[in-house]
Amino acid sequence: MGTNQRAQIVMDDDEIEEFLRRSRTATLATRGREGSVHLVAMWYALLDGEIWFETKAKSQKAVNIRRDPAVSVMVEDGVTYDRLRGVAVEGTAEIVDDPDSLLRVGISVWERYNGEYTDEMRPFVDQMMHKRVAVRVVPTRVRSWDHAKLGLPDMPVAGSTAAFL
């Protein structure tokens, strides 16, 4: 893709926020002890425009972040080239374990994936967050793409994987 096309497909800040708000799953990359990349699919919270995760305090990703807080997060969508879009965030992860932040992240995750939060849900959210930490991603670089901006004709879903979609 040429330089002009790259500039054409970039999402603005509002488009990025809307895309992240509507999407469901992110891929989180952390670095293992020997430098290997540890990739995991994660549900996430979106708080004040920032991506947050919740995870077990002793999970491999939490161990990796404590050792090396550099992370990458990608959220992507689209099954044909003309509809590919996504956001990739490079940044620093901060482990947060204060009760107010944990509850805020827990409520956001609950609402994104289960439905409206009410006071009756509090025991479920508390249980969900038991022995967990929140992870805040502080971005240092954000890249985005939306191939729909290229104005290509609709492409059919085809190939050996099409039958499984």
Give residue ranges: language-model regions.
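A generic local structural motif
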Residues: 12-15, 38-40, 58-60, 121-123
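Alpha-helix boundary recognition
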Residues: 20-21, 66-67, 129
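Short beta-strand segments
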Residues: 23-57, 63-65, 72-77, 85
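Short beta-strand segments in beta-sandwich/barrel cores
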Residues: 26, 51, 71, 93-94, ...
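Short secondary-structure boundary/capping segments
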Residues: 17-18, 63, 79, 125-127
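Short, basic/aromatic recognition patches
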Residues: 2-27
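Amphipathic alpha-helical interface surfaces
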Residues: 16, 61-64, 102-109
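Charged, gly/pro-rich active-site loop segments
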Residues: 2-11, 81-165
